[in-house]
Amino acid sequence: MSARKRVKRASAYDLYRTCKQAGTCPPDVIPKVEGDTIADKILKFGGLAIYLGGLGIGTWSTGRVAAGGSPRYTPLRTAGSTSSLASIGSRAVTAGTRPSIGAGIPLDTLETLGALRPGVYEDTVLPEAPAIVTPDAVPADSGLDALSIGTDSSTETLITLLEPEGPEDIAVLELQPLDRPTWQVSNAVHQSSAYHAPLQLQSSIAETSGLENIFVGGSGLGDTGGENIELTYFGSPRTSTPRSIASKSRGILNWFSKRYYTQVPTEDPEVFSSQTFANPLYEAEPAVLKGPSGRVGLSQVYKPDTLTTRSGTEVGPQLHVRYSLSTIHEDVEAIPYTVDENTQGLAFVPLHEEQAGFEEIELDDFSETHRLLPQNTSSTPVGSGVRRSLIPTQEFSATRPTGVVTYGSPDTYSASPVTDPDSTSPSLVIDDTTTTPIIIIDGHTVDLYSSNYTLHPSLLRKRKKRKHA
């Protein structure tokens, strides 16, 4: 079975006409038609306190009135709707009258005209009066002078020419151009394949406007009475790093907020050696001022070591320490600068003096004993069989001059070291039996009982890790 189609209920106004008298209206129909909903009540009572303009909200404007109810708002009619006096009946409607509200019978009133197209114009006149008002007396027509109009129905038209009255002489006025100054007009003609500006000649009689491109330019005539003032930018920085030092405003407006210090003269310039600032932003630039004594000096606000709390607050006065410089008396005799005749003069050495001849002495002499180049080259067989190969080896023959280093007394050692007879290096003999043995490694002496050497890490004793139980 198919579901029943839900039928839309009739509008509230259609239900109100049939169910009001029978008393079977739904609960939402009567308040909506009679304008007694919650929204209507809010507008009705709120309109007493506020002004809502000419909207008719809360002012009980005239509309369709139901029996026993209040007026409602009437919407505009559809486009093309008209209303006339005939739809009202034989009742006469005059300005300033309102239709009476009957009890129990709905009344039809004059509705508004269409919103899109106006209807028939309605005028408040009486039905008994004529629609067209004619004047009591009609003025006589004097007609046209010297003009006849034919009223014949034939195709021929009679035309009567008006003859001029007076002499037949006709005055001919010659138009002469006025004496005007000559104007200079510059014409800019653009010779283009797409557009050619037409060139017209200037005329002072007929049309003066043309299609020329007129450019007006030049300088002013006479003295303009002005002055050239350079443009100045206000508020813009003049340097890459603007220097704005915040100045203290304390004590300027309030006299009691000024801070006073006790000035203490000092003769120790070391007081100014250690300068510390809590906030360098408020420190002014160094200034040279003249004191009461007339001498220039150094001054600084100094806070001596006083009581200090646990929070770091220092309790105690601040002193203004001043160090005045010494005064140069006027009676001091100036010592003249004199040069003693016995003073030894200065010797001037010319920089561009010609160089004298000098002898070149070689610091090193190359001989056979210093040769480290290989003398003989031989080959050593490596491997066996097919893989046997010969590797060239070089035999070096080099000698190095060495000296004799002897420790202790020369009589202690019976054997003497072998030395090179051609060596010119001196022998070093240390005649001291208490000298600690020294080992020479690559020409550097190493003391066995001192700490001037470092062993290789492989020779150091390794530490064993302790095992924790």
Curated annotation (Swiss-Prot):
Motif (Nuclear localization signal): 1-10, 461-468
UniProt GO molecular function: DNA binding; SNARE binding; structural molecule activity
Biased composition (Low complexity): 414-429
GO cellular component: host cell; host cell endoplasmic reticulum membrane; host cell Golgi apparatus; host cell late endosome membrane; host cell nucleus; viral capsid
Keyword Cell inner membrane included in the entry's annotation: no
PTM comment text: Highly phosphorylated.
InterPro entries: Late_L2 (IPR000784)
One Pfam short name: Late_protein_L2
Disordered as annotated region, ranges: 401-429
Domain of life of the organism encoding this protein: Viruses
Major localisation: virion
GO biological process: endocytosis involved in viral entry into host cell; microtubule-dependent intracellular transport of viral material towards nucleus; viral DNA genome packaging; viral penetration into host nucleus
Disulphide bonds in the chain: 19-25
Subcellular location: Virion; Host nucleus; Host early endosome; Host Golgi apparatus
Keyword line: Capsid protein, Cytoplasmic inwards viral transport, Disulfide bond, DNA-binding, Host endosome, Host Golgi apparatus, Host nucleus, Host-virus interaction, Late protein, Microtubular inwards viral transport, Phosphoprotein, Viral penetration into host nucleus, Virion, Virus entry into host cell
Family: Belongs to the papillomaviridae L2 protein family.
Role of this protein: Minor protein of the capsid that localizes along the inner surface of the virion, within the central cavities beneath the L1 pentamers. Plays a role in capsid stabilization through interaction with the major capsid protein L1. Once the virion enters the host cell, L2 escorts the genomic DNA into the nucleus by promoting escape from the endosomal compartments and traffic through the host Golgi network.
Subunit structure: Interacts with major capsid protein L1. Interacts with E2; this interaction inhibits E2 transcriptional activity but not the DNA replication function E2. Interacts with host GADD45GIP1. Interacts with host HSPA8; this interaction is required for L2 nuclear translocation. Interacts with host importins KPNB2 and KPNB3. Forms a complex with importin alpha2-beta1 heterodimers via interaction with the importin alpha2 adapter. Interacts with host DYNLT1; this interaction is essential for virus intracellular transport during entry.
The protein's name: Minor capsid protein L2
